[in-house]
Amino acid sequence: MAVSVPGYSPSFKRPPETVRLRRKRSRDHGAAVPASLPEPAPRRAALAAGLPLRPFPTAGGRGGAAATIARRNPFARLDNRPRVSDEASEEPLRGPQGASGPLLDSNEENNLLWEDTSSHERTGTELSQSQRVSLSESDTWSSDGTELPVDWSIKTRLLFTSSQPFSWADHLKAQEEAQGLVQHCRATEVTLPQSIQDPKLSTALRCAFQQALVYWLHPAFSWLPLFPRIGADRKMAAKTSPWSADETLQHALMSDWSVSFTSLYNLLKTKLCPYFYVCSYQFTVLFRAAGLAGSSVITALISPTTRGLREAMRNEGIEFSLPLLEEIGHKKKVRDPSLESEEEQAVSDEDEEESFSWLEEIGVQDQIKKPDVISIKLRKEKHEVQMDHRPESVVLVKGLNTFKLLNFLINCKSLVATSGAQAGLPPTLLSPIAFRGASMQMLKARSSNVKTQALSGYRDKFSLDITGPVMPHALHSMSMLLRSSQRGSFSAGLYAHEPTAVFNVGLSLDKELDRKVAREDLANCGLHPKTLEQLSQRPVLGKSSLRSVEMSDYILSWRS
């Protein structure tokens, strides 16, 4: 017969004695613990150093008032509660221009997603998330007197503000509108006085403004937004595209597009067109005539690119360079000459294949584990793949290779999307002058005024909003017009199409360009002489573009 043991229950369903004993142990243990525990030495040192620590765990028990030593939480050392006062004190450190957009670090910039949306339709939250700042972008203002640095990026929006009204830009008369179009087609040079007393009564100013808004586009469909093309699938999703499922119509569109593209290149080659853009759903190409950007030959920049596109260009015999990678590599060598060991490592990688053949000769290739050919190739191409779709992937083509690039783009099957909202739609051609098959388009301009709070009450603030594909010549023309109409005082916010910001990268030139001769050769390209002089300068902005411009007393300052 089994002997019953006090506190033991064979069924383990109702162990009353066990529970009673545990409660008794807890009371006895709590009585032996002092009411206040001394703080550990590391905690005292941290408090002396001024670290914000949580209160030291006090004694407490599970059984009502019984006291037990609470186990320490290793993750609760620092006070991670939000501190409003600290965040408020850090806000002024961003400077007076800090509210225009957040400055992102280099990692966020490298993970840049180029999905462009119309800036005037964005909310404040969307705008702060979409504005991306390149690595060379700074929050300091630079001044170069009376001229801006050349900016080859395409702007999607210009927002000018001034203490003087922009009413002169509204409701142009029929005669002024017609005269402005004629001035554009005939490339009439307009010279305005330094200051216009009554801009609304100045016919020359209003005609010049109409002239500056004109640009040329192919193809043109009034119901379809054709710029920007990168990341525009969402905008085009609800639009009608009759060519998406009609191969005959797609072939006709591509045939007309090839004729227009060839016409533009011929105008560029004969220096009758200064530059033009090819905007596809994957990348953008900038063709520049000889004499612009400090180059004595025709240049073409492509951004962003992928390893597949670069490999296809190599297979077609197109010689190109990666200017940003060359610039970064040169800076690294200047800072650290020991980087030559990396080149030696690359040479050793090439010798690996020879070592494998030597193993086969001595007959031990099966006994030694070696990487396969695919692994070796992937390791060599790792760095090249990592820069795909990034600003560092920008490609520069110069001289006669630009003609090869022309033929490559015309025959490239991946130039046109095969599915999605842009299926079957040829790339967009943008040019400052007319070309075969082009359609004349106008930038949209709208002026308004708001009340802003000042020390003495409220004052009027006037704004001029220009939207559309604003090319470099249009930005310079607008700055010259506003210099006269706003009496040398205005500010501007510039919104760039991010894939084109990298077009401001500097070029490695074989010889110095005679800018005077270049301007004479391009005298018939359709641009104002002052605009042509600015575009002939070498780019200095690098991967960034102009973000803000301010003119005060006819002195320009800018921020990139």
Curated annotation (Swiss-Prot):
Disruption phenotype: Early embryonic lethality. Heterozygous mice show no overt phenotype. The keyword Zinc does not apply. Belongs to the DONSON family. Residues 125-140 have a biased composition (Polar residues). Residues 34-53 have a biased composition (Low complexity). This is Protein downstream neighbor of Son. The gene is Donson. Component of the replisome complex composed of at least MCM2, MCM7, PCNA and TICRR; interaction at least with PCNA occurs during DNA replication. Replisome component that maintains genome stability by protecting stalled or damaged replication forks. After the induction of replication stress, required for the stabilization of stalled replication forks, the efficient activation of the intra-S-phase and G/2M cell-cycle checkpoints and the maintenance of genome stability. Its main location: nucleus. It comes from Mus musculus. GO terms for biological process: DNA damage checkpoint signaling; DNA replication; mitotic DNA replication checkpoint signaling; mitotic G2 DNA damage checkpoint signaling; replication fork processing.
